[in-house]
């Protein structure tokens, strides 16, 4: 186990959910990763990274071919979530902006297909919908038009951190 806390919190949550008769629904931010060295830079997608005065040396993205390293990493993590914790109720993907802008890089349908191959009953959710093949959407501040069923999470402030 390569976790600083030396605990697998997802496993603990999965066990607690099963014990309580609840389905495990997992959140995964596929559209932004501030720590992976090969995620998109701010020059391609503004919220992709914090706005540092100087780009940290750990950021190694130089061209779109580098993105495959991030995507392989994300797919491996999602596969782990689908195989290591028993049946899951679903996966809720977040930050859709980069996925909209670079749909050919993310190839989100391939990820959806992988999830459904491993966990056929799992629901797939992606904010306002990435490609229309989500089971439902969860708009925030606005409602998308790709998926027919949605839950609303509208904020009354100017910033989600308020």
Where are these regions (language model features)?
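Mature catalytic domains of secreted/periplasmic carbohydrate-active enzymes
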Residues: 1-158
